């Protein structure tokens, strides 16, 4: 029996890096873009997010919660330049992109999969690590197989190798986007990263493919107290690993499961986390799963996921900085600040939220990466101190030699005078 969906959405997340020396100019660029709007979080409107994150993380991650009353009025009246100065000093800045109308697209040919782009958000950290996020919803289809194919195809549309492929798989039919290239051009325009820049980018830090963050709720007749989840396992693993519907059903499950962490705290929903995706799979047998859960997953959990990705990319960027001798001294302050503010900090008292973040941290191997960087830096810093001490010793020796010469000359002069 073909699986049917009750509700679904997918966020595609593209990380990119802005030179930290140009970060304030990039913020100014977004502020001047008429379609970009600086996002101000408000306690009344975003109460779930406000209550979910602990104060220290909330103050770091969502500084605009403090924008209220006269502070908010003053900010709104400020010039673009002044807003840029305020925003660029904050740890995190969020922008929404005005689509004017929902953008409808199509994957495939005449009988392809219609979808709409519902939301675009830009999340920037002061370190220069940013995220372009795009929310999509499939329309005119409740086939689970269509969701599998859509997620699989769409995650690669920003690939630098896309021009080597046929465009048969993805076609955009809308007055806003005439072709899939329009989406990639929008990404390039917002991020400021051209194809030429992509070639220069360090691929060990970021890639051109999207991270996939997806939610799907199946119709209750597919998964309930009378059904066996074993019949859903193959589809669940394909969904979890962003694989197409026609992927060989005899694939090596043990290998895929080795790279997959599944959270199963509740009976009728599972959250599957890999290094490049976080996908929630649930049943409509429980009304919570299609009422409150999708909202929570695309708000509290979504920002938790972004924070986990940020930590991973920040550490990988620090690791890459070891290649540049001049960066080693500068990275010390960044590493200390990161450790002080974000490392080994609880982000929430919500049990499920903590479980999700801890699982994500384990999948992204954050502890291993942190320890590796800490050990590398300790070794290199000791070497730098040894070099520094050697220089000091050399200077002392030179000064002693000059002192000896000076004293010798003085003695000779005195001897000459008395003689």
Go through each PLM region and give its residues.
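N-proximal short alpha-helices
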Residues: 87, 287-291, 346
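Extended, charged amphipathic alpha-helical segments
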Residues: 233-316
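Generic structural hydrophobic/aromatic packing signal, biased to beta-strands
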Residues: 12-14, 132, 271, 278-281, ...
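A broadly conserved detector of short glycine/acidic/proline-rich loop/turn motifs that flank catalytic sites
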Residues: 136, 284-286, 342
């Amino acid at each position: 029996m073909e699986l049917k969906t009750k509700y679904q959405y997918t966020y595609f997340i593209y990380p990119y890096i802005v030179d930290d020396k140009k970060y304030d100019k990039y913020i100014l660029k977004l502020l001047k873009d008429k379609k970009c709007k600086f996002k101000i979080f408000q306690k009344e409107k975003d109460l779930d997010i406000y209550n979910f994150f602990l104060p220290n993380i909330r103050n770091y991650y969502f500084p605009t919660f403090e924008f209220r009353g006269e502070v908010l009025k003053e900010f709104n009246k400020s010039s673009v330049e002044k807003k840029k100065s305020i925003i660029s000093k904050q740890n995190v800045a969020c922008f929404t992109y005005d689509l004017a109308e929902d953008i409808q697209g199509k994957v495939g040919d005449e009988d392809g999969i219609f979808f709409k782009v519902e939301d675009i958000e830009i999340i920037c950290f002061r370190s220069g690590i940013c995220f372009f996020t795009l929310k999509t919803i499939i329309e005119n289809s409740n086939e689970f197989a269509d969701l599998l194919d859509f997620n699989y195809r769409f995650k690669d549309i920003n690939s630098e190798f896309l021009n080597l492929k046929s465009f048969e798989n993805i076609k955009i039919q809308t007055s806003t986007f005439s072709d899939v290239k329009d989406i990639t051009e929008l990404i390039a325009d917002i991020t400021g990263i051209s194809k030429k820049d992509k070639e220069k980018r360090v691929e060990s830090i970021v890639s051109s493919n999207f991270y996939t963050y997806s939610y799907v709720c199946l119709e209750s007749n597919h998964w309930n107290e009378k059904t066996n989840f074993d019949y859903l396992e193959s589809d669940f693993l394909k969904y979890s690993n962003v694989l197409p519907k026609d992927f060989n059903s005899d694939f090596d499950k043990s290998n895929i499961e080795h790279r997959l962490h599944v959270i199963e705290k509740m009976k009728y929903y599972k959250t599957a986390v890999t290094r490049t995706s976080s996908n929630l799979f649930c049943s409509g047998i429980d009304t919570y799963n299609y009422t409150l859960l999708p909202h929570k997953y695309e708000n509290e959990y979504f920002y938790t996921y972004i924070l986990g990705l940020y930590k991973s990319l920040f550490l990988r960027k620090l690791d890459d900085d070891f290649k540049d001798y001049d960066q080693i001294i500068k990275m010390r302050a960044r590493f200390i600040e990161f450790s002080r503010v974000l490392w080994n900090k609880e982000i929430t008292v919500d049990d499920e939220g903590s479980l999700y973040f801890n699982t994500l941290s384990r999948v992204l191997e954050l502890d291993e990466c942190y320890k590796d960087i800490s050990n590398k830096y300790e070794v290199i810093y000791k070497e730098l101190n040894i070099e520094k001490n050697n220089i000091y010793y050399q200077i002392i020796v030179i000064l002693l030699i000059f002192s000896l010469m000076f004293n010798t000359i003085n003695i000779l002069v005195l001897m000459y005078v008395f003689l």
